[in-house]
Amino acid sequence: MKVISPMDDSPAGRAGVQAGDVISAIDGQNAAGLTVSEVSEKLRGAIGASVTVTFLRDGEEPREVVLVREVIKVESVTGRLEGDFGYLRISTFNENTGRELTETIERLKREKPGLKGFVLDLRNNGGGLLNAAIDVSDAFMERGEIVSQRGRKPDDIERYAAKPGDLTGGLPLVVLINYGSASASEIVAGALKDQERATVVGLTSFGKGSVQTVIPLRGGQDGALSITTARYYTPSGRSIQKIGIEPDLEVARSEAEARIVSRSSFIYSEAAYATALDSSIGAERKGPHTPHEAPGKDFDKTKDYQLQRALDVLRAGGDLSKLAAAPDTIVVTAPGTKPVETAEVDTDAPDDATPD
């Protein structure tokens, strides 16, 4: 059982649980083979009671964490100042997200007149309501399509467009994503990227771009049937399903996160599931590779390099050609470079051939 995204300010989030961590044991009992509902039942309990969970993470020893159960209060939007810039964090997309985002942007503008840009952090945001994703995208756009929803028939298309009124007045915007960003997060990132409203920084998102419809059986007496009825497409016509949103600047948050992306046996995405719906456009998700920029062993692990780089992009006015060089503690690799263990071997090369 893999963690999709730990909730902000939850016991697991505060304990350092990350997207992609695998739950291997709960209170000493092996969790292998348990269903989602069975794992949820074991994790739930009385407020104040503790549960011991063992997590597996790539390249590290099993980690045992004691979590104290509490009521989880979901705050959809938070924000703070980062120097001359505003930082906006959306943890989930619910019925309050649009209103909370508007209030947070206005508060930051009052606290710091003359703001020079915003970072919109959607990392480890597993999604939520479509309407909330549309509201968030619309908050940063003056016009243009946000997303389209397409069914099996050619004429079965529903389009959603922005209304006039960019709450930030067109200030430079950076969207942060990673492999824990899914569904509604991908709709927002895809819209703002395709409409050239934002620069996307981080790692390729999860790739959850399908629409499910729930059909009650006998009025709900016999349960319900959930079927996939459509796919989401970005304004440029790209399917989100299985492919995800690729960043304009690929940056890993930590050395450990870079290892996850480069691991041949681990692709944290919708594409990793054998039963996942195809993208429908023939495109494929990029396989394991070395992230373009990743912290090295000497990088301060308490720092958030992805956020640092997002702020660098804002300082460059959103122009990647003017971006400051990565610091010495960052490993910079050519985009798309495969890790040594997954690189293709040229079988036609002579035995005495040596690499350049």
Give residue spans per PLM region:
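C-terminal "post-core" interaction segments
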Residues: 73, 78-356
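Ligand-binding face of N-terminal immunoglobulin V-set domains in extracellular IgSF glycoproteins
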Residues: 4
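Conserved PDZ fold ligand-binding element
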Residues: 9-34
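PDZ-domain C-terminal substructure recognizer with occasional recognition of PDZ-binding tails
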Residues: 24, 38-77, 156, 228-229
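Short acidic/polar active-site loop segments enriched in Thr and Asp
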Residues: 18, 49, 116
